[in-house]
Amino acid sequence: MKKTKIVCTMGPNTNDREMMRKLIQNGMNVARFNFSHGDHEEQKFRMDMLKELREEEHTNTAILLDTKGPEIRTGILKDGKKITLKEGETFTLTTEDIVGDNKRVSITYKGLVQDIYKGCTILIDDGLIGLRVESKTETEIVCSVVNGGELGERKGVNVPNVAIRLPAITEKDKDDIRFGVEQDIDFIAASFVRNAECVLEIKAYLKELGAPYIPIIAKVENAEGIENIDEIIRAADGIMVARGDLGVEIPAEEVPHLQKMIIQKCNDNFKTVITATQMLDSMMRNPRPTRAEVTDVANAVYDGTDAVMLSGETAQGKYPLEALQMMVHIVETTEEHLDYDSILVKAGDHLKSGVSSAIGYASVLAAANLNARCIITPSVSGATTRVVSNLRPRQEILGITPNERTLRRMSIYWGVRGLKSLEFHTTDDICSGAIDLAQAKKCVDSGDIVVLTAGIPSPSVQREKGSVSNMMRI
């Protein structure tokens, strides 16, 4: 079984029930619903289908809602036709609501005029088109075209190294999150997170909706997010390394070391981390990936990512199933070559103080020394399972919980197989019940050595933030 989890983006391809079923059967752990596209009716159709299929297939496939976020886009064009911008020409961005042409186009963020300055760079459509600001009025930004090309409708606008004063959460995001809560989603991927305040605003809104339990994965997509990465990691439940916009906002050659830095920081802080964007991009058109793409996926696994993500590859590419199967194959092959002993030593060197960390590390160390069959982590909240997962043991981790939401959240935890249990009330119940369940699911056999770690309520143990792991048995 692969340990690194895979997030697949839903789209036109997955309107086909059997295609969605095949993705579930072939290794998709989390289904991503991108709310930059489609309406609620379309998204509900796919979510309902996924829920039906995971029941039929007896899986815990989680649902991740990816918000559109406070992004800037260009407006519509005359007759919907693309325009051609040529190097050296003058092109104007306007906050007025107009139908664009080859002279000017509207933008969705009216405050951009105040945020930018003469001489700064504006990039459109993932950086394919580059503009330099020459002058501005109250409603217009007059630019010269530095890098020309074809411009279509509603393309993304990036302004590198400029602090944009967009709201942390838009009205559309609120509407989409409200809809997601009604649909019992498992994660929110918050787009264009710039600081901890962005995360806290979304958490406050979730509390208003009566859903404070939904984890927030912060998407770091610009220089401001990188600058504030430590406070964002503290505030969020996880991080998505969104390399698409990130590689536009900052020099592309900076992305690899930033990816490694973010993954390491998330590992050190027991936070989920997803590596995303263009991982097998060529498989949108071709049945096989490039060697560079294979290496990219493998390096993310070596770096310590919890999950890797497929975007357009599964949403609308020509080879959605083949892309997933290739991702699984790359991940499994790479994991065969991981140096688990070195990983464990490194984890010990960076171990944070606290009972949960100490017990988790002792459990993984014992499992390694005894060549245990697996590590069993009974947990209502999933906190114990998360700690053990972050230590990256060679052994399979059985995350056992009576909580359906926790079970689905475990779908993104590295190395974890989630199992649904009954409620346990005593320490003996926890231990015997968890082992009985593991045997019933054929995860262990009689005579196998297993390590079990859990959190047992105890007045003598200082409770850390959230739950505390304070018991280990062999």
Question: Which residues fall in each region the model found?
Answer:
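Non-catalytic helical/linker scaffolds that mediate oligomerization, partner binding
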Residues: M1-I474
